[in-house]
A protein has these predicted regions:
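Short acidic donor-binding loop at the edge of a beta-strand
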Residues: 186-189, 383, 580-581
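Short loop-beta-helix segment that forms the pyridoxal 5′-phosphate
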Residues: 158-163, 553-556
């Protein structure tokens, strides 16, 4: 990490161990487990394995009457997020934030967003309640969950949701720090959430990852995980500003490490290589006094994680205290890592380190792990590191140093982030109904076709490796390989390049197949292949796997503007010096249910199409003297909810006719505007039906490399 230190000035969390952090600390002092009956599951499994469920009885903590009414109408995702926001911001959110609403950014992480609404919609359809079904379908995207939870709050800055499965919350915090350091916001709310759901329970059970006995991390007879739920949020400010305001930071973010295994969709690398890389970056400033393990209790995860610890810490490992709290919270998916970190920080303030539960450690397999088991240990660790890992091989490790509550807080001198870094677009890749490249995009407005043909895809894909994949990752892989041909990237260059994917609706076809089968066959007979191919970050996962990309990876999800949002986040990471380049890829599938829902929302017939597009964004500096098209800025806002637009607003207010190709539409319009050379300065705007509005500004000088065959 580079630039000014970032302070965690306020925190909030809900989990199976308590509906606020104070109640969690009290529970973690003893031997209480939050694992119990999973009454909130939409279906009951034949064998009750239990889960970590949050008590969402009506709360009055820090919530206005309006937010109370809101949470009673919402499903669990919106309730968890809104309750945490109310805790975080208190009774006077405007005074708490103390900056203009446009300067408050939000980066959230989630595994499944509003997926519970999908099951509700399908049940409404089966009952013939079509209007209710359409309304429920609109609640699935992450943008809908976020917009509902933000109702009435003074938050109007950049707002995005990222997904890299169970590493989502820590990934969101990493991106939030970059947004803050880039100057795009004065403060950032970051963290993650996920509710318990039949979608997740059925899938993990089908993969044989759910334990019937206790979750027992690093034990010889460990059986697997327990599903959980929760939400954990932090309010971030630059440390100098926080101190100037008289705020007492709970902690300072010391370092963050990110990596990808590029190994398997649902299994970690057996030697923990990616996790070791992330940990090494996170502890560059010093070893932790306490390590919060990911520790899902599955055979593969715990073995790989231990190998990562041995690689990262070596002979120092036995001296580092380790805690594994999913044995008490369950696995909260998109809140994982952040939830355990905040609970542990509060326990440290209270003078103890919390312990996990379950069966004893297997000392033969894990001889060097100093695991806190059953009994909390007295102590107030100064430096704490947390690791999170997710499907697709994403790894994020984060280290903090405690501050406030009597601990000294100082501003540490660090290398300043670049103040005038320029970000260029070296190359683009594209597949659309018009064919391959920008020439294909140009034909879309006049084409009657809406979907990418197999004739376009197959020359770009290894059929033996991709024929069983969902369409979404195939579109992304094809666009990336088109870009690779344009830019001439080597395998080594790809391996070290960070990856940000984007999708509005994800793998829509496989998701529908999985969920309809789940409802027809029952929660105990879910399809494991369809589940793995339906998670929102499946695109970034398969691109990482297919191209051997081992740096940071995540997917921006749930809005029509997700493609522009991914470009914004990549631009922030490049501008603050964390990344030199980034591969940004976006894709969306067409689907009749998407068309029906958008038609219902907008009052006009919508016929969506499929497309994939990739951008190679990189820093323009002395080592890169070429004249490249340049991304000069972004504007963003939250406006009144409205219909999805079939076209983009370009330079001078002119309308660029782009068919409905999801989150690809905005970036496609940008590429066409740059390539047209009608103006040196380009601006393209796009708005999501939930009111998230984004504009990207660019200078069109230089050559935009693209593979233009059709």
């Amino acid at each position: 990490m580079t630039g000014v230190p970032i302070a965690i000035v306020r925190v909030a969390a809900l989990g199976a161990m308590g509906t606020d952090l104070d109640s969690m600390v009290a529970a973690l002092r003893g031997d209480h487990s939050g694992i119990g009956p999973a009454n909130a599951l939409e279906q009951r499994p034949a064998s009750e394995a239990g889960a970590g469920q949050v008590d969402l009885g009506v709360s009055t903590d820090g919530a206005s009457d309006g937010s109370q009414q809101h949470t009673q109408r919402a499903d669990r995702a919106e309730q968890l997020l809104r309750r945490a926001l109310d805790q975080l911001l208190g009774t006077d959110p405007t005074a708490t934030l103390a900056v203009d609403a446009s300067q408050v950014a939000m980066v959230l992480g989630t595994t499944l967003a509003g997926m519970r609404h999908c099951g509700a919609a399908m049940r409404f359809e089966s009952s013939g309640c079509i209007s209710d079904a359409m309304r429920s379908y609109t609640g699935i995207p992450a943008g809908s969950v976020m917009r509902q939870a933000l109702a009435g709050l003074p938050i109007a800055g950049a707002a995005s949701t990222v997904s890299c499965a169970c590493a989502s919350a820590l990934s969101a915090i990493a991106h939030g720090c970059a947004v803050l350091r880039s100057g795009a916001a004065s403060c950032v709310i970051a963290g993650g959430y996920d509710p318990i759901s039949e979608f997740a329970y059925g899938g993990f059970s089908a993969l044989q990852l759910v334990a019937t006995g206790p979750l027992s991390p690093f034990a010889h007879d460990r059986q697997g995980m327990k599903l959980g739920e929760g939400c954990a949020l932090v309010l971030l400010r630059p440390l100098p500003e926080a101190l100037a305001r008289g705020e007492s930071p709970l902690a300072i973010i010391d370092a963050i490490g990110e990596s990808s295994d590029a190994h398997h969709l649902t299994q970690p690398h057996p030697e923990g290589r990616g996790a070791a890389v992330a940990l090494a970056s996170a502890v560059v400033n010093g070893l932790p006094d306490l390590l919060i393990a990911h520790a899902t209790g599955t055979a593969g995860n715990d073995a790989a994680e231990y190998q990562a610890y041995r690689t990262a810490f070596g002979a120092a490992l036995p001296g580092i205290a380790v805690t594994a709290l999913k044995s008490r919270f369950g696995h909260p998916l998109g809140a994982a890592g952040a939830l355990e970190l905040l609970a542990t920080l509060k326990c440290a303030d209270a003078g103890f380190m919390p312990a996990g539960l379950g069966r004893p450690v297997d000392r033969h397999a894990f001889p060097d792990i100093n695991l806190l088991h059953t009994e909390p240990r007295a102590g107030s660790p100064h430096r704490i590191t947390v690791l999170a890992a997710g499907f697709g091989g994403a790894n994020v490790a984060l280290s903090v140093t405690r501050g406030g509550n009597g601990a000294p807080v100082t501003v540490t001198e660090r290398r300043a982030a670049p103040t005038s870094v320029r970000v260029g677009i070296r190359a683009v890749g594209c597949v659309s109904a018009g064919g391959r490249g920008l020439s294909g995009l140009r034909q879309l407005a006049d084409s009657t076709e809406r979907d990418v043909s197999e004739e376009t895809l197959m020359p770009l894909l290894d059929r033996s490796r991709t024929r069983r994949l969902a369409l979404l990752p195939r579109l992304m892989l094809a666009a990336c390989r088109d870009l690779r041909d344009a830019a001439g990237l080597t395998a080594d260059e790809l391996a070290s390049t960070p990856l940000l994917a984007a999708s509005w609706h994800g793998a829509a076809s496989f998701t529908e197949q999985y969920y309809r089968d789940l409802l027809a066959s029952g929660i105990d007979l879910a399809n494991p292949v369809l589940f793995a191919e339906s998670v929102p970050n499946v695109g970034s996962a398969h691109v990482s796997l297919g191209l051997g990309m081992r740096a940071a990876s995540a997917t921006v999800i749930g809005t029509r503007t997700a493609g522009l949002e991914a470009m914004f986040l990549a631009s922030c990471r490049i501008r603050v010096g964390e990344w030199h380049r980034a591969l940004v890829v976006m894709a969306d599938e067409s689907h009749p249910t998407i068309d029906a829902v958008l038609s219902h929302c907008t009052g006009r017939a919508v016929r969506s199409g499929s497309a994939g597009m990739a951008f190679l964004m990189e820093r323009i500096d002395g080592s890169n003297p070429e004249l490249l098209p340049e991304v000069t800025g972004f504007e963003h806002g939250i406006v009144e909810r409205g219909g999805s637009r079939p076209a983009m607003t370009g330079h001078g207010g002119a309308t660029i006719m782009i068919p409905e190709i999801g989150c690809v539409a905005g970036p496609a319009a940008l590429a066409l505007e740059i390539a047209s050379r009608q103006s040196n300065e380009v601006a393209v705007s796009c708005t999501d039906p939930n009111g998230f509005s984004w504009t990207v500004q660019a200078s069109a000088h230089g050559d935009l490399k693209s593979f233009a065959t059709v």
